[in-house]
């Protein structure tokens, strides 16, 4: 599993994942902006939605 905003999330059905795939398994509402921009981090490093995600990664997605 990976961790998303502190919650364990199991990714399944694919061999490899990118950050945007996480949204299929973690409920994060992108339809209503709650800040000026969306911050996405993988293991503390700023990332974009095409960044690869691996087992045991820590993902953070939040508005700033």
Show the residue positions of the predicted features.
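Ubiquitin-like/PB1-type beta-grasp interaction modules and other compact soluble beta-rich domains
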Residues: 1-64
């Amino acid at each position: 599993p990976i961790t998303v905003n502190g919650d364990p999330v199991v990714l399944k059905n694919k061999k490899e994942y990118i950050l945007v795939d996480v949204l299929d398994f973690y409920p994060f509402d992108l339809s209503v902006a709650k800040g000026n921009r969306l911050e996405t981090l993988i293991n503390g490093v700023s990332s974009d939605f095409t960044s690869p995600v691996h087992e045991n990664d820590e993902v953070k997605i939040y508005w700033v």
